């Protein structure tokens, strides 16, 4: 029995030495030994081969259902006025004359049926479906047996992900999070000074780099000259808590976010000991006022870290950008927009908080192939003369969506948890009524107020 324990101890010692020497230490100094790059290149070749084999199998087996991309129906992208004009072609009339035709009803019937089948909102809160299988059963709805070789490759992938990568990633996650909790707690006892701020930044960025290695993260940063400066506000589209790890690998931030429980709550409480992060309860009005005051004080001090905010207020599945809350744009500071786009071939980064708790989500990430993403730093933006916070937020959101290749939606991500506001319905009613009574349709506005 003692011999077995000795062998186990030796194996553990060898394992930790390899992890520390080849991964943890290089990560702490921001150095890559190239293992992840080689792994990603090999993975790309494997997935390309699997895609070709699946396509050939679909030709050989006509009954095999084709993989569906995100979206199951094709919709017109035109405005209400454009689509109704198209319907009225058989009865050409001038909209400005205030005429009504019965065929107008077909437009609303069509839109209603489209939204019953597939609306623009709820599909943003579920995982993105892939056009081609990435050898993960969780991302393939229509998989059937195609060939022995493909099945063997899938089996080898399961072994690699669960028997090799998962233990390695759990080890790195434990090291990284332990470093964060212990390090921030110790730094928190120091008096406020430049040394404390430097140590806090060191603890945070080291933790994020180790955790990124634990996800086999490959991150490409573009336009680094536009990185957020101290005293500014960094806003980004939000897909998952991993967004923080991705951005903080390239610089430190003071963060603003919703209070969480469980593992996430432990991490939040430890982080705030050494750095002025702002955690709040969304349902508490007094918390909102306190957050607003702290944000104003923060951005007025040009020596403090840039604030990282996700104005959508919830996680979206990285296919679109939803409405930005105006609160982040009411302080008159410089906004540094950042677009984050994940490559879904290697793993689904979206956190469906209604379906998975934090631990379950992390395990899903650790059993994925890798996290591959692009980060674009956009030029800083400021509020223009005569521009209110709502229009400023929409302008920033559009810039992020355009750069990241995401769909720009005006809908509120809060619909994930609440019902549609009456104002949404009223805006559509106002637009149509302005058409049939002959008013200038541009007087009506579309989207949430």
Curated annotation (Swiss-Prot):
GO terms for molecular function: 1-acylglycerol-3-phosphate O-acyltransferase activity; glycerol-3-phosphate O-acyltransferase activity. Pathway: Glycerolipid metabolism; triacylglycerol biosynthesis; Phospholipid metabolism; CDP-diacylglycerol biosynthesis; CDP-diacylglycerol from sn-glycerol 3-phosphate: step 1/3. GO terms for cellular component: endoplasmic reticulum; endoplasmic reticulum membrane. Keywords: Acyltransferase, Endoplasmic reticulum, Lipid biosynthesis, Lipid metabolism, Membrane, Phospholipid biosynthesis, Phospholipid metabolism, Transferase, Transmembrane, Transmembrane helix. The chain crosses the membrane at residues 9-29, 146-166, 170-190, 358-378. SUPFAM superfamilies: Glycerol-3-phosphate (1)-acyltransferase. It is found in: Endoplasmic reticulum membrane. CDD domains: LPLAT_LPCAT1-like. It is a multi-pass membrane protein. The keyword Chaperone does not apply. Converts glycerol-3-phosphate to 1-acyl-sn-glycerol-3-phosphate (lysophosphatidic acid or LPA) by incorporating an acyl moiety at the sn-1 position of the glycerol backbone. Also converts LPA into 1,2-diacyl-sn-glycerol-3-phosphate (phosphatidic acid or PA) by incorporating an acyl moiety at the sn-2 position of the glycerol backbone. Protects cells against lipotoxicity. The HXXXXD motif is essential for acyltransferase activity and may constitute the binding site for the phosphate moiety of the glycerol-3-phosphate. PANTHER family: GLYCEROL-3-PHOSPHATE ACYLTRANSFERASE 3, PHOSPHOLIPID ACYLTRANSFERASE. This is Glycerol-3-phosphate acyltransferase 3. It comes from Danio rerio.
């Amino acid at each position: 029995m003692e011999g077995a324990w000795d062998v186990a101890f030796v194996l553990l010692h060898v394992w930790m030495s390899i992890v520390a020497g080849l991964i943890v230490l290089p990560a702490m100094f921001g150095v890559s030994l190239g293992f992840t790059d080689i792994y990603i290149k090999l993975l790309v070749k494997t997935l390309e081969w699997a895609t070709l084999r699946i396509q050939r199998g679909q030709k050989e087996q006509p009954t095999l259902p084709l993989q569906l991309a995100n979206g199951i129906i094709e919709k017109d992208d035109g405005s209400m006025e454009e689509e109704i004009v198209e319907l009225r072609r058989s009865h050409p009339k001038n909209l400005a004359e205030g005429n009504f035709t019965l065929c107008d009803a077909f437009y609303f019937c069509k839109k209603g049926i489209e939204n019953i089948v597939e609306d623009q909102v709820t599909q943003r809160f579920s995982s993105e479906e892939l056009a081609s299988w990435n050898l993960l059963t969780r991302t393939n709805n229509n998989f059937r047996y195609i060939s022995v070789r493909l099945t063997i490759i899938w089996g080898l992938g399961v072994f690699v992900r669960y028997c090799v990568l998962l233990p390695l990633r759990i080890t790195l996650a434990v090291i990284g999070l332990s470093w964060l909790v212990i390090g921030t707690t110790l730094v928190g006892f120091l008096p406020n000074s430049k040394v404390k701020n430097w140590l806090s930044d060191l603890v945070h960025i080291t933790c994020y780099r180790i955790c990124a290695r634990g996800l086999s993260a490959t991150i490409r940063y573009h336009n680094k000259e536009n990185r957020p400066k101290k005293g500014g506000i960094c806003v980004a589209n939000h897909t998952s808590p991993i967004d923080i790890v991705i951005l903080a690998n390239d610089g430190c931030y003071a963060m603003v976010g919703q209070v969480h429980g469980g593992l996430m709550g432990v991490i939040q409480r430890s982080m705030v000991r050494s750095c002025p992060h702002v955690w709040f309860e969304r349902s508490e009005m007094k918390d909102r006022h306190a957050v607003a005051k702290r944000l104003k004080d923060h951005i007025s001090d040009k020596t403090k870290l840039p604030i990282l905010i996700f104005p959508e207020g919830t996680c979206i599945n990285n296919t679109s950008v939803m409405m930005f809350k105006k609160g982040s744009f009411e302080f008159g500071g410089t906004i540094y927009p950042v677009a984050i786009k994940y490559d879904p071939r290697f793993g689904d980064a979206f956190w469906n908080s209604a379906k998975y708790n934090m631990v379950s989500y992390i395990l899903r990430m650790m059993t994925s192939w890798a996290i591959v993403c692009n980060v674009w730093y956009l030029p800083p933006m400021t509020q223009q003369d005569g521009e209110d916070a709502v229009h400023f937020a929409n302008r920033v959101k559009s810039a992020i969506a355009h750069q990241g290749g995401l769909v720009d939606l005006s809908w509120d991500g809060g619909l994930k948890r609440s019902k549609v506001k009456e104002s949404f319905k009223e805006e559509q009613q106002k637009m149509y009524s302005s058409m049939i009574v002959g008013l200038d349709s541009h007087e009506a506005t579309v989207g949430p107020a």
